[in-house]
């Protein structure tokens, strides 16, 4: 083929996304021309290109193709847009376990004909029929199972000739049977590549086909290598066992041969009895000879020469010798065996010839060589006597040593140790007070070891074996201090100035007194009352809030005839005894007749009531409420409805004090008011605000004694009559007329949304005695559990789900895990606007609204006070109040809160948070 035709073929294949190598293409075209011969003239270029593609599918991609781009296999996220051709290296089904695939590949049906004793044709007809039925059922079950079972996901190993990467089949794109090594696939669309893995589906790839014979692989070997399982382990084990058995047999044969060769020069009997020469066959029997001659006279020639035994002398210097006094166990000297003596005798036989040289005659007889036991005992006795003498003479341990038996005559002096039984070891005695002769035991009455102060009736002591008696633990017990009363340091006390009445000469000067503000629980009021007796002049609680002035430079005295008197403090200590009797009884705070008299006392405001102009000049911070113990005691009684119990303590005339004005001094004005009311019908005493018959009383709810701060007596449907306006003072009418403007419909709806419903079920816990957190006694645990149960804490999610079954709104107690503020604090000019997200264990991020009354109690000021500051351009004070409000709102982030939430049965209404407390305050724990 000419170069022009080859270039045209190369460009045509490139348009088909086959970027072949030019050299491989030329060789491939030459091979095709040689195969076709003369028919090549009738073949078009496109037909030649198709033949080249078929030849490429059966060739290695590394030899024929140039990769269009280098794929970054280490990239985390890549999208391949170009069309690329890859070659399959291997494929694995990752939908099933590799072990299951390996077991299927290695499974084979064993022929058990040898076990049955013949082929299946020899069986009876019944058995053949049964076997056919079972085989057919098994075949049908297998076919059904194979038909139902779907092929799983394939993991394919691919290469583009340079890079090797893996592909995961998301859909059933390829057939597992045709995924042979060397097959080619092409990418047709956008393919995602994640960490070197291509994600393939039907829309982005196609199968081209092909196969390379040289790239075939064994699937069983692939699975076994992946699982690291050696399938030939049993064969290798059998081969190794056979080799070991053959080696052991060869070793045994070699041992037997060696043993046989060694026994050629030995007799089967004892060599001492018979000696046989295997070479010549001669047998020699040695002559029996006695070891020791029995004759009384021994000839010198008949005595064998005994070689001298050389005793090795120690070569180490004396400094390295072991002079320890410990006994080293030694085995007795072994006696030489009899055959050793016999060998010596045989080595030196008796000689009868006189011409032989004679050995030197023995100096003693043989009988004298026998060791006598008596002589040994005598020698040992002498040795012991010498040792004792040496020990008595020496006095230092360093001077004595033990020498061997042959050198006792040269031994040094040895220190003696007296082991007499009469001598006793001296024991160091400690002082008597440091010694406890016996362990802890129960002392008896009259024990001299006890002090005179501790001698008492021992039977009273509670004895424990582990700790001892109570009298030993008295010093460790300390009386717990009562921490319910806290004395405030003077640095935290605010100094205020009270204005005294000019009529009293003693109180004309300004009196510097301290108004103590005490937070937390109150107890021991009597102690505080004794401390407060030093105050010279008692003023009314609210006197220091408002200062009555006639002009800016001088003080004016009120028209009161008598100075105000301090009402008696309610003694809470007496009420603690009988609180249990009145646990379910809640009395109203005051009678209605007293309230009417108080309203009458405010009728004439010209003399006693301070004008609004003078009120503006009063330097008074309404956000700070200062109270004394007296005031807080009465507030606590009013809060829990215990005002009625002090009827036997507080006199009637002292109850008629309203803001420092005595009702008894306004009799004339009451008479004028009564005379003006003569022309009008008198109201009923039972219902003073109505001239109509009394309507029926709404019965209280079942849980009305649990209402807490929201407690009120049973409601009455009271119709307000026209006579009420005459009771209200004129200044209050004026203020009300100016402040109360008729809002529009939208303002009324917003106002109703931000207030509690009139008909609502409330769940509250009864008043309980405050517990001390430092008390760890087990008696308080049941009380805490009971109080926790009385709180009736519910999951917020249950309340929101079950409210569709309610007929009215309910107040539920929830324990949030976290609360987060949605927006900044806002106001519409009347109420506060604040929404928070509440999350507990049952629900997450529920939007709730916080009531205005709760925010007023938390902040200490309301919206109206902020408006007044804004109108007066007091920006700094307004900014300070805003910062204080934001700081106090951080308390919603606490993790120990309890929320009282009003939940409406309507789903479109947001839950309203009415109260918030910590768990310790809710359980009344100090």
From Swiss-Prot:
Keywords: Chromosome, DNA damage, DNA repair, DNA replication, DNA-binding, Isopeptide bond, Meiosis, Nucleus, Ubl conjugation. It is found in: Nucleus; Chromosome; Nucleus, Nucleoplasm. One of its GO terms (biological process) is protein localization to nucleus. Expressed in the germline (at protein level). InterPro entries: RMI1_N, RMI1_N_C_sf, RMI1_OB. The keyword Ubl conjugation applies. One of its GO terms (molecular function) is DNA binding. Residues 734-755 are annotated as: Disordered. The keyword Cytoplasm does not apply. There is a cross-link at residues 428, 654 (Glycyl lysine isopeptide (Lys-Gly) (interchain with G-Cter in SUMO2)). One of its GO terms (cellular component) is RecQ family helicase-topoisomerase III complex. Component of the RMI complex, containing at least top-3, rmh-1 and rmh-2. Component of the BTR double Holliday Junction dissolution complex composed of at least him-6, top-3, rmh-1 and rmif-2, which is involved in double strand break repair in the germline. Interacts with rmif-2; the interaction is direct and is required for mutual stability and localization at nuclear foci. May interact with him-6; the interaction is required for mutual stability and localization at nuclear foci. May interact with top-3. Belongs to the RMI1 family. Essential component of the RMI complex, a complex that plays an important role in the processing of homologous recombination intermediates to limit DNA crossover formation in cells. Component of the BTR double Holliday Junction dissolution complex, which is involved in homologous recombination during meiotic double strand break repair in the germline. Promotes top-3 binding to double Holliday junctions (DHJ) and hence stimulates top-3-mediated dissolution. This is RecQ-mediated genome instability protein 1 homolog. It comes from Caenorhabditis elegans. The gene is rmh-1.
């Amino acid at each position: 083929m000419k170069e022009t035709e080859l270039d045209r073929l190369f460009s045509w294949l490139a348009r088909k996304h086959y970027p072949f190598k030019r050299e491989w293409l030329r060789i491939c075209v030459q091979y095709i021309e040689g195969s076709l011969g003369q028919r090549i003239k009738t073949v078009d270029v496109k037909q030649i290109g198709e033949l080249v593609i078929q030849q490429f599918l059966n060739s290695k991609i590394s030899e024929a193709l140039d990769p269009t781009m280098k794929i970054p296999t280490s990239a985390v996220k890549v999208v391949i847009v170009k069309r690329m051709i890859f070659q399959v290296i291997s494929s694995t089904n990752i939908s099933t376990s590799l072990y299951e695939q390996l077991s299927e590949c290695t499974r084979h049906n064993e022929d058990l004909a040898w076990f049955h004793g013949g082929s299946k044709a020899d069986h009876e007809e019944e058995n053949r029929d049964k076997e056919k039925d079972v085989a057919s059922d098994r075949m049908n079950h297998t076919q059904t199972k194979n038909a139902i079972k779907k092929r799983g996901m394939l993991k394919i190993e691919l290469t583009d000739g340079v890079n090797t990467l893996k592909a995961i089949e998301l859909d059933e794109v390829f057939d597992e049977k045709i995924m042979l090594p060397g097959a080619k696939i092409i990418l047709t669309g956008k393919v995602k590549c994640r960490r070197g893995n291509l994600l393939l589906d039907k829309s982005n790839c196609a199968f081209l086909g092909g196969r390379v014979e040289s790239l075939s692989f064994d699937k069983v070997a692939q699975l076994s290598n992946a699982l690291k399982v050696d399938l030939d382990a049993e064969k290798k084990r059998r081969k190794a066992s056979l080799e070991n058995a053959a080696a052991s047999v060869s070793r045994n044969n070699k041992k037997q041969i060696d043993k046989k060769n060694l026994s050629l020069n030995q007799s089967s009997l004892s060599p001492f009895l018979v000696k046989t020469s295997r070479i010549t066959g001669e047998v020699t029997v040695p002559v029996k000879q006695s070891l020791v001659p029995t004759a009384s006279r021994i000839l010198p020639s008949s005595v064998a020469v005994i070689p001298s035994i050389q005793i090795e002398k120690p070569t180490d210097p004396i400094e390295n010798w072991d002079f320890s006094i410990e006994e080293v166990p030694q085995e007795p000297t072994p006696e030489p065996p009899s055959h050793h003596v016999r060998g010596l005798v045989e080595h030196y036989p008796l000689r009868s010839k006189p011409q032989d040289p004679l050995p030197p005659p023995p100096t003693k007889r043989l009988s004298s060589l026998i060791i006598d036991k008596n002589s040994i005992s005598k020698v040992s006795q002498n040795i012991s006597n010498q040792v004792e003498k040496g020990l008595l003479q020496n006095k230092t341990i360093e001077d004595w040593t033990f020498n061997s038996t042959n050198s006792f005559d040269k031994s040094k002096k040895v220190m003696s140790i007296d082991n007499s039984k009469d001598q006793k070891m001296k024991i160091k005695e400690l002082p008597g007070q440091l010694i406890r002769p016996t362990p802890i035991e129960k002392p008896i009455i009259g024990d001299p070891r006890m002090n005179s102060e501790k001698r008492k009736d021992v039977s009273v002591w509670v004895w424990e074996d582990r700790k001892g008696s109570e009298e030993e633990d008295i010093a460790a017990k300390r009386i717990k201090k009562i921490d319910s009363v806290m004395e405030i340091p003077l640095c935290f006390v605010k100094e205020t100035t009270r204005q005294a009445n000019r009529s009293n000469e003693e109180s004309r000067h300004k009196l510097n007194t301290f108004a103590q503000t005490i937070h937390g629980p109150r107890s021991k009021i009597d102690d505080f009352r004794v401390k407060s007796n030093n105050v010279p002049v008692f003023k009314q609680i609210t006197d220091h809030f408002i200062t009555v002035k006639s002009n800016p430079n001088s003080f004016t005295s009120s028209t009161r005839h008598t100075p105000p008197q301090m009402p008696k403090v309610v003694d809470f200590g007496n009420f603690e005894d009988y609180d249990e009797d009145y646990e379910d009884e809640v009395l109203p705070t005051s009678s209605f007749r007293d309230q009417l008299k108080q309203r009458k006392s405010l009728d004439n405001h010209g003399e006693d009531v301070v004008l609004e102009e003078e009120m503006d000049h009063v330097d008074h911070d309404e956000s700070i409420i200062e109270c004394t113990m007296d005031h807080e005691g009465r507030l606590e009684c009013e809060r829990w409805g215990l005002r009625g119990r002090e009827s036997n303590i507080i006199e009637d005339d002292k109850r008629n004090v309203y803001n420092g004005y005595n009702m008894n001094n306004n009799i004339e004005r009451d008479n004028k008011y009564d005379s003006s009311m003569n022309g009008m019908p008198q109201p009923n005493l039972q219902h003073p605000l109505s001239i109509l018959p009394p309507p029926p009383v709404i019965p209280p709810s079942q849980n009305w004694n649990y209402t807490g701060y929201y407690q009120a007596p049973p409601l009455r449907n009271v119709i307000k009559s026209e006579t009420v306006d005459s009771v209200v003072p004129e200044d209050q009418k004026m203020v009300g007329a100016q402040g109360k403007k008729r809002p529009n419909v939208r303002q009324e709806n917003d106002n109703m949304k931000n207030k509690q419903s009139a008909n609502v079920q409330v769940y509250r816990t009864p008043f309980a005695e405050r517990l001390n957190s430092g008390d760890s006694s087990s008696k308080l645990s049941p009380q805490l559990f009971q109080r926790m149960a009385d709180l009736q804490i519910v999951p917020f999610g249950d309340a929101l789900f079950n409210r569709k079954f309610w007929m009215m709104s309910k107040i539920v107690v929830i324990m949030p895990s976290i609360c987060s503020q949605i927006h900044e604090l806002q106001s519409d000019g009347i109420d506060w606007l604040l929404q928070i997200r509440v999350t507990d264990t049952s629900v997450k991020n529920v939007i709730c609204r916080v009531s205005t009354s709760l925010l007023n109690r938390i902040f200490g000021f309301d919206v109206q006070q902020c408006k007044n500051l804004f109108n007066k351009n007091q920006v700094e004070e307004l900014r300070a109040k805003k910062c204080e409000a934001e700081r106090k709102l951080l308390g919603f982030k606490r993790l120990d809160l309890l929320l009282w939430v009003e939940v409406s049965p309507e789903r479109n209404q947001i839950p309203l948070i009415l109260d918030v407390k910590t768990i310790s305050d809710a359980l009344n724990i100090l």
